[in-house]
């Protein structure tokens, strides 16, 4: 027999970082190709993204090639195609993987805030990004040129950048000059003058060539010199005019030196003497001097000593001008030993006088256009350029060119370049010491090359993900932990460096604890998710539509394969780098495609499709409303469901609904089939026959359906499902047609009406589900709202009007005397007979005998009232009352309280039947005549317009400002509108049967405000406005009523019955539209509010019957700014007492005289109890003198002091057992005492109690009287005071259950008025109760149509938002570690920090108002009032700690600091504000729901001093965890001595590293060492507080030094923050900031214990609430076939 059980299978879920091995182990094979499906065969490509070999077969139990088909081959791997034969479901589960050609960083760990990689490696995110994406660093630096390389590998002229130069300079000796970079040299080089060109070449200091082009403009004097002359000047020598160029000389004759022949050369003017052939002499040549004669002839033979020439004298040649000597090109000369020159033949010597000269240096590589000696004209081109753009010049070269071309080029002393950067991954320790570099330092590529040249093979640097991977692999986490801990000891705990270090330490510990390896954050392998989770679908036209993921995977595979190919080819590094960067970007895009969530643009390119739409990555699939969490895991679709339009079902019982036959057949098809099959055989043909019976709609099918439906229930749901009453169970009744029929009374909980609303039907399938639906969800048992404990399933509209019509009476009824009544009846039956026979009508006054409370009485009433009372329980009948909406609601509630839920449900059905019947009988219609306009209206309007005219005149004369004018007019019209409203109401009431009056008065539809607009006056209209406008802001600042700024001062003085004119119509449209827009804008906002509330509270369930606490909150009226927001009886209803309630006078437990109920601890308070306790007051003595007998065993049960000295105790000492002991020692048996009965009671008068002079308040309403106050009363001669008991009730706020709340602190389950059951999901109920009206708040504007005076919704919602997000409206600025509020709306409210009195309110020298408070001890406390704030107190007023002294917003953390541990005062202040917002809108919600939300908002604390925990200062930690940690520390500290003995002889499970006094890290012990006493002593001296040892193969941690507990401060969180800080990672991830939550959880290896509801829904098991509790897990529900049951019954 089938069983259904409630067992939950998953205990907890852990998340970790996947290692490459784990990813490969998940995979069914490597995806090598980017192809998906073959376009011809439509089969998946082998090794592609849809490969069957990797992911499983496309067809069930069939391999790709078709060799193996059918289930019998399951598990076989086809040898042809390699596909395993299995179910195609495998394609939803089996994963693949991609082996990356180069590592890629997981983007989540880089872009998280704070960056995980950055924190762990101690690097900034920008540096990390630069490394990973092969970025560069912009460097502005000087450049140097090598002038003398000496013994280095440099060459002369090498260019070195400053960064490299600094590195080289430390190790090598070489000379450099600073270089200048040439910019914008002007070209070509032009001659500035006419002249002659001279070219000259020379080498510069850097070994480069400079060509000098010299152009001279000259005057030239020619001087001829003759052979034999001696030149006394050199070429290029400067001479003056008249200076000798040659010597003046006499030349002797020439004689033959030996015998020989003469040869004369006339051309060269020389004589050669050749010796005789016999002689050994050599030939001699003589130049014939100018003017000498030759005495021999050519060929003549001469003897030694013969004269050959005559003597001659040569004059000197003088320079005709001053200038430079230039030898002519034809000049033939011979240098003499004395440095002069002998002229050998006639030639020219020039003297040049330079008029102008220009020099043009040209750098090597430039093209020179001229040659030596060329004549050039001014403007002629000499060279194409003198310098090249971007040329580097040494300082010397720069000077040369600067002097010759002063304005023709610019230079830069520093260059600006983007240098690729690398990170050091390995370095020799000596090199590290020498250079100061360490692993993880970032250097530019140039610097790295410089280091590499100096220290070859001793330093390694790299870029890209592989560099990050190496860094992470190099991390020694244990040593790093010891190093950080040692450094932290030296720093003040609040310093920013310490906080940064603690964050890093936490991460290190997380990695150590979770067993994750840091290098796993860099991917070697990328997992490929199953293909059915990223499907391709064929669309018309033969094309395929595919998921974005496939495109992202495709790009990744393409880039990966390209990189593999390039690596095989040995491509250059620059190409590889680019390809690796693109691969990294492809991996990024797959994981998280898009800019960072915080709005900061990432450096990554966003991958887009053809249409420019960013592709959806894995992160996008998880996060947001459409993500995996919220759409698929938390928002599953439900099978066995249908949906249809709803219509009213007037004949249904409250627990029934009408389901269309067709729909029922479809929903219950399996059950019908089972029943049909159960009777016959189950062969295939039979099955087909049965199916046909259903599909052909044969009568047998309907009969079986009727049977199947009998006794089962279905669930009806109407969207939006705002609270649990939006899903209720009903018994289905088959109906014709296509619409679901709904009982009219259950419309309010569903918020349904019949204007086209649709509802969904769900069938609970199992017996367990059916039982749960029937007993817990049946609409019959859900007529009481869990939000406020009053009925919610209530009659509306027609039913109300029917009941009202039935019980209403004519005008003359009350004045009619009994003796004048015409008709008298002995019983209701008799009266009915008379009615049916037409003698009387429903409203005819009659006298009739009826039974009231068991007695027969004769009363005056009407038949209608008799009929109506006939359906009521006997004790609730009232024959002289009109039953309108309020009365009926009260009636249903009272019936429920007295007779239970079933009777109340039956009553609702009866009221429905009677209401519909008599609404029909009433013949209710609407006509224009029913709208009675008050006759006085016109006169009132005439007078008002006259008053307006006077105001306008005063304004024009300048007596009023614009604001005053507007304000006066608005006030005037508001009072007139009010007056006309009253008149309209009065006019209508003249006829009790006026249909409009009946509708409004009965509460069936509409209100007097709408009637006023129809028949009275429309009044003032609201403007559309911008809340950010200056006008509004200034009003808020000044604390003025905003509504004046938002109101037209021109009224619509007509009503809708008469119609309005054009202008008034236009004004009306403004307000109407504003209403529509506000509603649209705020509905989504309210939905978001509900969602945050649910997220915060979803884990709060009732976890135990009683946590045992004696703490609680004080019962009181909630008063906000003088307005009572909630009366004490409402506050007390549904609560459990935390302490006994004592009678103020007798101090004994209080007893209710009517019921005899005693109000002891743990008593639950009903409505009646709450009313009794709230109204219980007594006048009690302030003080009494008594003499007590101290031999008795008890002290007085009130506060008492001794009235005479006893031993060392003075008079006025509190009476305690010590005092009694002292009295007994003195031999006394009786002592005089002063008893103060008022101490511990609560002052119960609303008017404060003043002192004798009437200047100072001694007691204020609801103040708890203590002994100090009692003595003040005594001093002021006050004898008796009206007081009530001090009532402390339990509350979720003070509950001490570790998880959730206990039943006693929660109190009554408002939906059934019994103590709440363990397992009830009270958190969700609270969130729904608060959120559901939020949407109501927004939707109410509809019906008022923007009329001024209708309280604006926005205000209500904004208040709610402000309360739940208390910091969203504050601008917090940190200064010196403390948060300061700089600006709030207006100003910050000042809180009183003591109990005391307002001594004075004065102004200081600067003109600021100061409030002086005197406390009970007489100390004065001064409070300066902010400029914009209003003072809320007056002189002599009593103020209590935590009260506000000025207007403005409460700064919650300041209030929290003022109060005790529990945060109750803060919660009560929040409660007042938020209750006020809801009460104004007429919404009732029980306080306990708010308290649960506040409990969650107060569930965290900020760490002040982390002590020996892993937390960081200012970190938010759940209070539960802190308390647990501190408790464990206290227990651990007590065991230290015992542990020290226990660990001796054990084996260490981890090595132990400590810091020496010199600051060095040393290893004290290795893993596996035995713990000796000596080693333990060393460990203790090193300050190590706990060690890990092996115990039976398990690692156990022992504490060996006392630890410090955590010091903390309670925090009030906003809803969003409370939800995000939820301890379970699954729920937090599903809320918001999914990626960050998962990242943090994975690093920690966080375990989600699945405590809350959301987590369990996500993992797909029963929630740990209600029937899902472990208590019920063992229950098995047997599914008994109905036939068997029927047999048994028969």
Curated annotation (Swiss-Prot):
EC no.?
2.7.7.6
What molecular function terms (GO) are annotated for this protein?
DNA binding; DNA-directed RNA polymerase activity; magnesium ion binding; zinc ion binding
Entry binding sites for Mg(2+): 753, 755, 757
Q: Name one GO cellular component term.
A: DNA-directed RNA polymerase complex
Q: Which UniProt keywords apply?
A: DNA-directed RNA polymerase, Magnesium, Metal-binding, Nucleotidyltransferase, Transcription, Transferase, Zinc
Which cysteines share a disulfide bond? Answer: none
User: Which cofactors are named for this entry?
Assistant: Mg(2+); Zn(2+)
Give me the reactions it catalyses.
RNA(n) + a ribonucleoside 5'-triphosphate = RNA(n+1) + diphosphate
The domain of life for this entry's organism is Bacteria
* InterPro entries, per database record: DNA-dir_RpoC_beta_prime (IPR045867), DNA-dir_RpoC_beta_prime_bact (IPR012754), RNA_pol_asu (IPR000722), RNA_pol_N (IPR006592), RNA_pol_Rpb1_1 (IPR007080), RNA_pol_Rpb1_3 (IPR007066), RNA_pol_Rpb1_3_sf (IPR042102), RNA_pol_Rpb1_4 (IPR007083)
Bound how, and how many: what does the cofactor note say?
Binds 1 Mg(2+) ion per subunit. Binds 2 Zn(2+) ions per subunit.
Key word Ligase present: no
**Does this UniProt record's set of keywords contain Transcription?**
yes
Query: Which residues take part in binding Zn(2+) 1?
Result: 63, 65, 78, 81
Q: Which GO terms describe its biological process?
A: DNA-templated transcription
Which residues are noted in the entry as Zn(2+) 2-binding? 1107, 1295, 1302, 1305
The entry describes its oligomerization and partners as: The RNAP catalytic core consists of 2 alpha, 1 beta, 1 beta' and 1 omega subunit. When a sigma factor is associated with the core the holoenzyme is formed, which can initiate transcription.
Function, as annotated: DNA-dependent RNA polymerase catalyzes the transcription of DNA into RNA using the four ribonucleoside triphosphates as substrates.
* Family in the record: Belongs to the RNA polymerase beta' chain family.
- Kindly provide the name given to this protein in its UniProt entry: DNA-directed RNA polymerase subunit beta'
Q: Name its species.
A: Thermotoga sp. (strain RQ2)
């Amino acid at each position: 027999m089938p069983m259904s059980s409630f067992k939950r299978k998953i205990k907890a879920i852990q998340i970790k970082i996947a290692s490459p091995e784990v990813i490969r182990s998940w995979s069914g094979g490597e995806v090598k190709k980017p192809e998906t499906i073959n376009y011809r065969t439509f089969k998946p490509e082998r090794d592609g993204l849809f490969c069957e070999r990797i992911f499983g077969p496309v067809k069930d139990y069939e391999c790709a090639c078709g060799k193996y088909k059918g289930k019998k081959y399951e598990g076989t791997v086809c040898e042809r195609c390699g596909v395993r034969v299995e179910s195609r479901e495998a394609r939803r589960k089996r994963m693949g993987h991609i082996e990356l050609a180069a590592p890629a960083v997981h983007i989540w760990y880089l872009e998280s805030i704070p960056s995980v990689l950055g924190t762990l490696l101690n690097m900034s995110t920008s540096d990390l990004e630069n490394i990973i994406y092969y970025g560069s660093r912009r460097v502005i630096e000087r450049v140097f040129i090598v002038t003398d390389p000496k013994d280095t590998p440099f060459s002369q002229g090498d260019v070195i950048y400053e960064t490299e130069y600094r590195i080289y300079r430390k190790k090598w000796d070489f000379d450099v000059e600073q270089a200048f970079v040439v910019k914008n040299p002007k070209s070509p080089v032009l001659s500035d003058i006419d002249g002659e060109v001279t070219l000259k070449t020379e080498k510069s200091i850097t070994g480069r060539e400079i060509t000098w082009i010299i152009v001279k403009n000259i005057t030239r004097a020619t001087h001829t010199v003759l052979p034999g002359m001696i030149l006394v000047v050199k070429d290029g020598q400067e001479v003056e005019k008249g200076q000798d160029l040659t010597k003046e000389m006499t030349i002797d004759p020439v004689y033959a030196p030996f015998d020989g022949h003469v040869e004369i050369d006339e051309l060269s003017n020389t004589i050669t003497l050749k010796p005789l052939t016999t002689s050994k002499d050599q030939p001699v040549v003589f130049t014939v001097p100018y003017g000498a004669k030759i005495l021999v002839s050519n060929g003549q033979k001469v003897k030694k000593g013969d004269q050959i020439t005559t003597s001659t004298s040569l004059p000197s040649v003088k320079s005709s001008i001053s200038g430079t000597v230039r030898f002519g090109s034809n000049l033939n000369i011979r240098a003499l030993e004395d440095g002069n020159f002998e002229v050998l033949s006639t030639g020219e010597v020039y003297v040049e006088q330079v008029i102008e000269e220009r020099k043009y240096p040209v750098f090597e590589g430039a093209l020179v256009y001229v040659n030596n000696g060329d004549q050039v004209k001014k403007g002629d081109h000499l060279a194409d350029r003198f310098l090249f753009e971007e040329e580097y010049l040494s300082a010397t070269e720069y000077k040369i060119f600067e002097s010759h071309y002063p304005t023709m080029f610019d230079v830069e002393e520093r260059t600006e370049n983007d240098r690729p950067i690398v990170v050091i991954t390995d370095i020799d320790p000596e090199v590290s010491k020498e250079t100061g570099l360490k692993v993880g330092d970032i250097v530019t590529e140039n610097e790295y090359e410089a280091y590499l040249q100096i220290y070859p093979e001793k330093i390694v640097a790299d870029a890209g993900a592989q560099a990050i991977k190496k860094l992470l692999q190099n991390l020694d986490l244990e040593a790093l932990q010891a190093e950080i801990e040692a450094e932290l000891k030296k720093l003040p705990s609040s310093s920013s460096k310490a906080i940064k270090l603690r964050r890093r330490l936490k991460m290190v510990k997380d990695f150590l604890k979770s067993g994750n390896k840091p290098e796993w954050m860099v991917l070697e392998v990328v997992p490929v998710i199953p293909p059915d989770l990223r499907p391709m679908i064929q669309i018309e036209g033969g094309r395929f539509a595919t998921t974005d993921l496939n495109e992202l995977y495709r790009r990744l595979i393409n880039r990966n394969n390209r990189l593999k190919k390039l690596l095989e080819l040995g491509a250059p590094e620059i190409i590889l780098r680019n390809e690796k960067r693109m691969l990294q970007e492809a991996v990024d895009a797959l994981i998280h495609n898009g800019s960072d969530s915080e709005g900061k643009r990432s450096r990554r390119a966003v991958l887009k499709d053809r249409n420019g739409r960013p592709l959806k990555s894995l992160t996008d699939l998880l996060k947001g409303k459409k993500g995996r969490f919220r759409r698929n895991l938390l928002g599953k679709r439900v099978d066995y469901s249908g949906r249809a339009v709803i219509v009213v079902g007037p004949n249904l019982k409250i627990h029934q609904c009408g389901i269309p036959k067709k729909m029922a057949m479809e929903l219950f098809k399996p059950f019908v089939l089972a029943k049909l099959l159960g009777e016959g055989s189950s062969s295939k043909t039979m099955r087909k026959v049965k199916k046909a019976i259903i599909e052909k709609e044969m009568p047998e099918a309907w009969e079986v359906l009727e049977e199947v439906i009998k006794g089962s229930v279905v669930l009806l749901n109407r969207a939006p499902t705002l609270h649990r009453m939006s899903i209720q169970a009903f018994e289905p009744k088959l109906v014709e047609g296509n619409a679901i029929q709904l009982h009219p009374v259950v419309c309010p909980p569903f918020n349904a009406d019949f204007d086209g609303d649709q509802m969904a039907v769900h069938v609970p399938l199992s017996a367990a589900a059916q039982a749960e639906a029937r007993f817990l969800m049946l609409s019959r048992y859900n007529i009481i709202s869990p939000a406020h404990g009053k009925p919610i399933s209530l009659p509306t509209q027609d039913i109300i009007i029917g009941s009202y019509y039935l019980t209403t009476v004519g005008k003359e009824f009350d004045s009619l005397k009994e003796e004048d009544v015409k008709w008298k009846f002995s019983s209701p039956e008799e009266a009915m007979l008379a009615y049916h026979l037409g003698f009387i009508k429903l409203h005819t006054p009659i006298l009739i005998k009826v039974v009231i409370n068991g007695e027969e009485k004769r009363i005056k009433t009407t038949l209608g009232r008799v009929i109506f009372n006939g359906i009521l329980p006997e004790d609730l009948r009232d024959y002289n009352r009109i039953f309108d909406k309020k009365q009926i609601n009260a009636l249903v509630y009272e019936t429920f309280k007295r007779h239970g839920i079933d009777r109340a449900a039956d009553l609702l059905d009866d009221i429905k039947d009677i209401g519909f019947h008599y609404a029909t009988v009433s013949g209710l219609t609407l006509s224009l005549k029913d709208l009675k306009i008050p006759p006085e209206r016109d006169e009132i309007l005439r007078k008002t317009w006259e008053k307006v005219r006077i105001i306008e005149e005063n304004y024009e004369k300048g007596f009023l400002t614009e604001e005053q004018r507007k304000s006066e007019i608005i006030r005037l019209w508001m009072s007139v509108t009010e007056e006309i409203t009253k008149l309209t109401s009065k006019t209508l009431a003249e006829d009790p049967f006026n249909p409009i009056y009946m509708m409004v008065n009965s509460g069936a539809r509409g209100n007097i405000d709408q009637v006023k607009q129809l028949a009275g006056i429309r009044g003032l209209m609201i403007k559309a406005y911008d809340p950010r406008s200056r006008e509004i802001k200034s009003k808020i600042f000044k604390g003025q009523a905003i509504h004046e700024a938002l109101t037209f001062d021109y009224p619509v003085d007509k009503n809708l019955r008469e119609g309005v004119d054009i202008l008034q119509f236009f004004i009306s449209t403004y307000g109407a539209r504003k209403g529509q827009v506000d509603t649209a804008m705020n509905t989504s906002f309210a939905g978001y509010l509900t969602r945050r509330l649910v997220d915060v509270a979803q884990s709060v369930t009732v976890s135990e019957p009683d946590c045992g606490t004696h703490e609680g909150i004080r019962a009181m009226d909630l008063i906000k700014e003088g307005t009572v927001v909630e009366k004490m009886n409402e506050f007390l209803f549904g609560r459990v007492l935390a302490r006994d309630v004592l009678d103020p006078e007798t101090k004994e437990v209080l007893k209710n005289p009517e019921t005899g109920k005693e109000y002891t601890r743990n008593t639950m308070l009903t409505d009646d109890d709450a009313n009794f306790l709230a109204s219980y007051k007594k006048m009690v003595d302030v003080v009494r003198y008594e003499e007590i007998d101290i031999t008795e065993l008890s002290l007085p049960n009130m506060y008492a002091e001794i009235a005479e000295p006893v031993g060392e105790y003075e008079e006025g000492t509190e009476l305690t057992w010590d005092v009694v002991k002292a009295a007994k020692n003195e031999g006394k048996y009786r002592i005089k005492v002063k008893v103060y009965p008022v101490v511990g009671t609560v002052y119960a008068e609303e008017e404060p109690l003043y002192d004798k002079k009437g200047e100072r308040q001694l007691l204020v309403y609801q103040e708890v009287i203590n002994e100090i106050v009692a003595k003040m009363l005594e001093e002021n001669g006050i004898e008796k005071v009206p007081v009530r008991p001090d009532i402390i009730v339990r509350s979720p706020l003070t509950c001490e259950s570790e998880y959730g709340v206990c039943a006693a602190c929660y109190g009554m389950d408002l939906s059934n008025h019994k103590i709440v059951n363990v397992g009830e999901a009270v958190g969700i109920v609270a969130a729904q109760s608060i959120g559901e009206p939020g949407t109501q708040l927004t939707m109410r504007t509809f019906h008022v149509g923007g009329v001024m005076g209708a309280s604006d919704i926005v205000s209500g919602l904004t208040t709610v938002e402000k309360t739940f997000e208390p910091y969203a409206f504050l601008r917090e600025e940190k200064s010196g570690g403390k948060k300061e509020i700089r600006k709030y709306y207006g100003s910050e409210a000042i809180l009183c920090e003591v109990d005391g009195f307002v001594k004075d309110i004065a102004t200081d020298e600067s003109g600021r108002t100061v409030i002086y408070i005197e406390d009970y001890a007489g100390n004065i406390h001064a409070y300066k009032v902010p400029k914009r704030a209003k003072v809320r107190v007056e002189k002599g007023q009593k103020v209590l700690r935590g009260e506000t002294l000025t207007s403005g917003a409460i700064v919650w953390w300041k209030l929290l600091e003022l109060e005790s541990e529990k945060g109750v005062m803060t919660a009560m202040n929040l409660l007042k504000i938020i209750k006020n917002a809801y009460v104004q809108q007429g919404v009732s919600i029980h306080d306990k729901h708010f308290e649960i939300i506040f409990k969650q908002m107060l569930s965290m604390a900020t760490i002040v001093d982390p002590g020996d925990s892993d937390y960081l200062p200012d970190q938010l930690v759940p209070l539960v965890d802190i308390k647990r940690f501190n408790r464990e520390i206290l227990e651990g500290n007590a065991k230290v001595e015992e542990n020290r003995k226990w660990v001796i002889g054990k084996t260490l499970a981890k090595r132990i590293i400590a810091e020496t006094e010199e600051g060095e890290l040393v290893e004290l012990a290795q893993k596996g060492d035995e713990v000796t006493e000596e080693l333990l002593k060393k460990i203790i001296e090193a300050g190590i507080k706990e060690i890990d040892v092996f115990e039976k193969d398990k690692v156990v941690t022992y504490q060996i030094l006392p630890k410090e507990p955590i010091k903390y401060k309670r925090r009030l969180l906003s809803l969003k923050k409370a939800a995000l800080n939820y301890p379970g990672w699954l729920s937090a991830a599903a809320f918001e900031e999914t990626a960050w939550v998962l990242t943090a959880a994975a690093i920690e290896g966080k375990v989600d214990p699945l405590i809350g509801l959301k987590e369990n829904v996500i993992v797909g098991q029963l929630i740990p609430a209600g029937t899902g509790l472990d208590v019920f897990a063992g229950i098995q529900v047997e599914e008994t076939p109905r036939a068997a049951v029927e047999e048994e019954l028969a």
